[in-house]
């Protein structure tokens, strides 16, 4: 397998939109020297293929992995493209091996918004399209459940480097009706495109000493205007672009992000289920904000 493996069929969690205080409760530590012969992966075999997915994105064992992520939100209209805001946070993925080659994982996302290229949380910023002061809401999403089963996920390989990306299309009713939320709502229906993926090494995937391989997360989302931008139904979209790293310990995470998470939700890192009720940014906005009429 030198380039792409056949048939495209993927399943990734919705959440793009994390670490315990001791190394023993971090992600299964991936940075160990191999002591056993490598076990070659037959990517044409559905069982091998999905095991590689689980090992790169998460873990083969019943355990939790965490990603620190950071990126930038851009705005694009028919007339212009502008940098709008930065974002950063921690993604928790609680994995379970279901047997028969299948895996379940549950995502929890906790983070906040920043100036671009910064890890410092901001309370407000000036929207470059409108000139209006916007007040972001913090990022809290999940739990989102995903099951992956044996099939042909699409991989690309270059030497020891290997990666896959997944296109996920979402279409659902907007919790913010345009009648009640004229500036926060983009319409009755939300259409989103997530193009997320993971990069790693074949040598790590074939290392029998590892249950969890080192991984870099790629974040690429095309969304309607986020509610707090107060763009209403003006033509245009947001493009979220970022990277994340499967962490081995707290030293892999920005100190500002660790301080925020420990303050915002103590125990988030060590818990496999830091909260029970499912939430997302639109529900959170509707719960904690009031409509802005103009």
Protein language model regions, located:
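Short beta-strand segments that buttress and anchor functional surface loops
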Residues: 71-73, 168, 221
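A short, Trp-centered hydrophobic/proline-enriched beta-strand micro-motif
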Residues: 61-71
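Extended, solvent-exposed polar beta/coil surface segments
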Residues: 12, 16, 56, 60-62, ...
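N-terminal secretory signal peptides and thylakoid transit peptides that target proteins
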Residues: 1-18
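Edge beta-strand at a domain terminus
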Residues: 220-294
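C-terminal segment of N-terminal export signals and the immediately downstream linker at the start
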Residues: 25-59
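Targeting-peptide/extracellular-domain and disordered-appendage signature
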Residues: 44, 70-92, 284-294
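Predominantly extracellular/secreted and cell-surface proteins with exposed
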Residues: 75, 79-215
């Amino acid at each position: 397998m030198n380039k792409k493996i056949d048939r495209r069929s993927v399943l990734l969690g919705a959440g793009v939109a994390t670490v315990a205080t001791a190394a023993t409760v971090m992600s299964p530590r991936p940075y160990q020297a191999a002591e056993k012969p490598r076990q070659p992966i037959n990517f044409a075999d559905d069982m091998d293929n999905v095991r590689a997915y689980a090992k790169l994105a998460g873990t083969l064992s019943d355990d939790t992995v965490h990603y620190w992520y950071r990126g930038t939100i851009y705005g694009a209209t028919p007339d212009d493209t502008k940098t709008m805001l930065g974002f950063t946070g921690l993604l928790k993925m609680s994995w379970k091996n279901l047997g028969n080659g299948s895996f379940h994982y549950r995502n929890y996302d906790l983070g906040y918004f920043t100036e671009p290229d910064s890890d410092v949380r901001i309370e407000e910023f000036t929207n470059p399209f409108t000139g209006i002061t916007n007040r972001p809401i913090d990022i809290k999403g999940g739990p989102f459940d995903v099951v992956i089963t044996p099939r042909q996920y699409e991989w690309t390989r270059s030497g020891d480097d290997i990666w896959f990306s997944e296109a996920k299309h979402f279409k659902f009713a907007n919790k913010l009706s345009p009648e009640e939320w004229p500036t926060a709502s983009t319409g009755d229906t939300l259409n989103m495109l997530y193009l997320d993926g993971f990069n790693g090494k074949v040598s790590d995937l074939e290392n029998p000493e590892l249950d969890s391989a080192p991984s870099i997360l790629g974040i690429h989302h095309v969304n309607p205007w986020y509610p707090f931008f107060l763009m209403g139904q003006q033509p245009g979209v947001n493009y979220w672009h970022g990277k994340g790293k499967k962490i081995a310990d707290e030293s892999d995470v920005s100190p500002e992000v660790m301080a925020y998470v420990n303050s915002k939700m103590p125990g988030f890192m060590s818990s496999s289920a830091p909260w029970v009720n499912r939430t997302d940014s639109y529900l959170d906005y509707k719960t904690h904000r009031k409509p802005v009429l103009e």
